Amino acid sequence: MAAPNEFYETLKQRLAGVKHIVLVLSGKGGVGKSTVASQMAIGLIHRGLKVGLLDIDLTGPSIPTMFGVADQQVHTSSEGWVPLYKYDQRLAIMSIGFLLDSRDEAVIWRGPKKNAMIQQFLSEVCWDELDCLVVDTPPGTSDEHLSIVDALKLCKPDGAILVTTPQGVALSDVRREAEFCRKARLKVLGVVENMSGFACPHCKDCTNLFSKGGGEKLAQEIAAPFLGAIPIDPMLGQSLSRGEDFLASCQAAPSYEAVAALIDPLMAQLGLVQATADTSTPSH
């Protein structure tokens, strides 16, 4: 492994062409963090931007499935790992899932090995010029998060998006995540409430299954922007399971407007502008 100073300098050079870095965090698993990360990446692509999506959720990598590339593997070059590209080379994807023999293989590693893999992921991937790198992190707060934030310190990430659900337990967990961000000096760019009621696929009416408005109240507590609430929508889940571009193929879905509405506030936070007036679907 490279000496610490050498590692940081190598990483800084690797990410020199990346304009913005956004981490997506959640206080616990199962709240839809990867769903939000994937849709933010896709939404930015539809604005004509070039995006990287780095899946560092080592024990539950779901990004490959969401983009229909779970059966593919990445290749190495003399420069390092080459990410998979989709959508006219405008989306670069890297995930631990590409390195496993099968999608059902369990990753049972101790902390030091996980941290070493995170350093590899960050420093040995050949990213091209990117408008934004979206990092899908593991759930919770652990040594892995400390490793990610520490490794990126010279690259000055823009901040983090916190994903929660309306339930009290999830909100309590994400409060701890917000405290982690404060201690790590990582700006909270916004809060997203996922699974905010159940959206009927027929009439699109939303029924509250849990308490309502918890994510927005949390955002007020920590003085962070509330980016929106996404209802439980079978069409969204089915689209992701099929590896489809939800924003392009499911515009009649009950959750479509809520998902699409996340993009403008994120771009405003990052100071990004739409690269083209053409928001048509990029080819795969």
Swiss-Prot record:
Pfam families tied to this protein: ParA
Residues given in the record as ATP binding sites: 27-34
GO cellular component: cytosol
GO biological process: iron-sulfur cluster assembly
Compartment annotation: Cytoplasm
SUPFAM superfamilies registered for this protein in UniProt: P-loop containing nucleoside triphosphate hydrolases (SSF52540)
InterPro entries (alphabetical): Mrp/NBP35_ATP-bd (IPR019591), NUBP2/Cfd1_eukaryotes (IPR028600), P-loop_NTPase (IPR027417), YlxH/NBP35 (IPR033756)
Keyword Coiled coil: no
GO molecular function: 4 iron, 4 sulfur cluster binding; ATP binding; ATP-dependent FeS chaperone activity; iron-sulfur cluster binding; metal ion binding
UniProt KW keywords: 4Fe-4S, ATP-binding, Cytoplasm, Iron, Iron-sulfur, Metal-binding, Nucleotide-binding
Main location: cytoplasm
Cofactor(s) in the UniProt record: [4Fe-4S] cluster
Ligand binding ([4Fe-4S] cluster): 200, 203
Family statement drawn from the similarity comment of this UniProt entry: Belongs to the Mrp/NBP35 ATP-binding proteins family. NUBP2/CFD1 subfamily.
Subunit structure: Heterotetramer of 2 NUBP1 and 2 NUBP2 chains.
Protein known as: Cytosolic Fe-S cluster assembly factor NUBP2 homolog
